[in-house]
Design a protein with these regions (language model features):
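Signature of N6-adenine DNA methyltransferases within the class I
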Residues: 2-205
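C-terminal target-recognition/interaction regions appended to catalytic cores
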Residues: 199-217
Length: 217
């Protein structure tokens, strides 16, 4: 669907994470959506990033002056960041974020659940922006949260930070084959009780204990 012409684009697109898109939209819709955007490799994006990308294209091409969205706060994480980087991390910096709050409290209108969101405003060209980080939150009543933020001015990077661009860091060759990140559990479902582990291992050596730094104090 073609968007109507506008100088400014403002929105609060649906909060559907990548893993929940099929549940909320259905397999057919998700497959058709990803096929239509195939050249941008969007399979790991949250639903809201399709809006962000399209608005960024309009601003880059001079068809809109500026856009601002409320999005999931995972916008600055690795998979969603791939949507931002073609606009922000290239030599020409075709689009710049001029205002951002990376992590802000929010109440989901669908079920009243407390969630975290991000806010971004972008315009064409290489421009510095204002980054506001939340440093204090206070619940006033069932529907309101008082929030205090501190501003920083500078070039806002795709990870919604200002300063050294750690996204350009490369792996240390000296660590190759001698350093490992180790095991990371993908969710609470991977944790089992000692009793269940013993019953599993009665048949085969399938479950092993995992320790991290917190267990070695």
């Amino acid at each position: 669907t073609a968007w109507p012409e506008a100088d400014y684009i403002v929105g609060n697109p649906p909060f559907l994470g990548n893993k929940r898109m099929r549940d909320g939209l259905g397999d057919g819709y998700v497959e058709a959506l990803r096929a239509a955007w195939k050249k941008h490799k969007p399979n790991s994006w949250d639903f809201v990033m399709y809006w962000w990308h399209h608005a960024a294209e309009l601003v880059r091409d001079g068809k809109a002056q500026r856009f601002g969205f409320i999005t999931t706060n995972s916008i600055h994480q690795t998979f969603n960041r791939r949507c931002l980087e073609p606009f922000l991390a290239n030599d020409k910096k075709t689009v710049s974020i001029t205002f951002a709050i990376p992590d802000h409290p929010w109440v989901d209108s669908a079920d009243g659940a407390a969630v975290r969101i991000a806010m971004t405003v972008a315009q064409k060209g290489a421009n510095e922006g204002v980054l506001r980080n939340v440093f204090h939150e206070k619940i006033l009543d069932d529907s309101e949260i008082s929030v205090e933020t501190s501003p920083t001015k500078g070039l806002i990077l795709p990870n919604l930070k200002i300063g050294v661009n750690t996204l350009l860091a490369e792996p240390l060759i000296s660590n190759e084959n001698i350093s490992s990140l180790g095991f990371i559990l993908g969710g609470k479902g991977f944790k089992v009780s000692l009793d269940l582990a013993n019953r599993i291992n009665a048949q085969a050596q399938l479950a092993f204990p995992i320790w991290n730094g917190n267990d070695l104090t």
